[in-house]
């Protein structure tokens, strides 16, 4: 999916494809970020760690978004080990996450895990991860570190919207562009946009996605990725409506009943409000006035911080076993 999205963005930016996909994905970003993600030095680079946010619903799993700068690698590794030691059959075994994470850096002699102040709550997890894999090879550094050596591999644990506050960002990306070091995730803000799901569901791009993904995988993603729309305030022709919604103007979202508001508004990306549970509004859980205010923010914020609208699939309840330490 990321390979296909990378191709669509590149073709659009280079004029080999309609301009609107890259225009959407570049919306609200400074020219420095746009230049960086279009740089030929990072042309084919993709994130090497991807965490899908998966909801288990009555109709099967749904992937609500993808995170290419995720926390939780160390936590998942610890859980894998704990459950394996307790006798559970864990996908990947006790060391699957550790082995997988170590494997993305190839044979680099030094692996630098660079954590920004904004992401500092995850630093203990990164330090644990480095210590479990190889403390002589893996090291954790703050946002001021810039002593990169030729051949180093870097895991970027800071957000692109925060670059102005990360002194190491400029020398890091310059060294990566010169091929003196490698870095993941690459500085491609468009791959961190939730609106990629809206591009996937856009009928104008269906054939392009099919060519890039193949019929089978396209059908798989159609079942997994919830229907998504970009809140673009550009007016529609009088006879047109947003597919799957029957609305002709985003203002009409305000008049939907609470049942009809089984929809989520989210900030698409490139914002300090675009991660965690921030920047998310579930229409069916909000009173009409709060939902209307969120709709207004989405419409008015398109140029600076685009929002997406996504069909909400309610998670299902499942039975789970647990261990009672008092009863044994």
Predicted features along the sequence, with ranges:
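Amphipathic alpha-helical regulatory segments at dimerization interfaces
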Residues: 7-8, 40, 255
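Low-complexity, highly charged intrinsically disordered N-terminal segments
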Residues: 1-36, 61-62
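Amphipathic, alpha-helical segments enriched in basic
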Residues: 29-31, 38, 47, 168-171, ...
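Domain-scale recognition of functional cores that engage charged ligands
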Residues: 55-57, 68-328
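Structured beta-strand/loop patches that form or line metal/cofactor-binding pockets in enzymes
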Residues: 23, 28, 37-48, 316-326
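Conserved metal-phosphate-binding beta-hairpin within the catalytic cores
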Residues: 39-70
């Amino acid at each position: 999916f990321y390979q296909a999205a990378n191709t669509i963005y590149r073709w659009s930016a280079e004029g080999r494809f309609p301009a609107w996909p890259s225009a959407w994905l570049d919306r609200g970003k400074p020219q420095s970020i746009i230049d960086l993600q279009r740089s030929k030095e990072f042309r084919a680079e993709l994130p090497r760690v991807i965490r899908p946010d998966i909801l288990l619903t009555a109709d099967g799993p749904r992937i609500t978004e993808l995170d290419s700068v995720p926390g939780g690698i160390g936590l998942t590794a610890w859980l894998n080990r704990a459950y394996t030691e307790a006798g559970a059959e864990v996908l990947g075994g006790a060391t699957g996450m550790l082995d997988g994470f170590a494997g993305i850096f190839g044979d680099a002699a030094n692996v630098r895990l660079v954590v920004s102040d904004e992401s500092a709550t995850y630093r203990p997890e990164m330090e644990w991860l480095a210590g479990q894999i190889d403390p002589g090879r893996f090291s954790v550094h703050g946002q001021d570190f810039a002593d990169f050596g030729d051949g180093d591999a870097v895991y970027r644990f800071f957000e692109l919207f925060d670059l102005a506050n990360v002194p190491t960002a400029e020398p890091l990306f310059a060294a990566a562009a010169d091929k003196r070091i490698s870095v993941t995730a690459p500085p491609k803000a468009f791959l961190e946009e939730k609106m990629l799901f809206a591009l996937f569901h856009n009928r104008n791009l269906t054939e392009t996605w099919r060519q890039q993904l193949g019929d089978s995988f396209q059908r798989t993603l159609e079942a997994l990725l919830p229907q998504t729309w970009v809140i673009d305030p550009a007016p529609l022709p009088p006879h047109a409506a947003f597919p799957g919604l029957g609305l002709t103007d985003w203002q009409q979202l305000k008049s939907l009943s609470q049942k009809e508001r089984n929809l989520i508004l989210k900030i698409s990306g490139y914002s300090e409000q675009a991660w965690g549970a921030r920047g998310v509004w579930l229409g069916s859980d909000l009173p009409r006035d709060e939902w209307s205010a969120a709709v207004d923010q989405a419409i008015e914020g398109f140029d600076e911080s685009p929002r997406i609208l996504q069909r909400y699939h309610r998670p299902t309840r499942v039975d789970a076993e647990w261990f009672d330490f008092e009863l044994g």
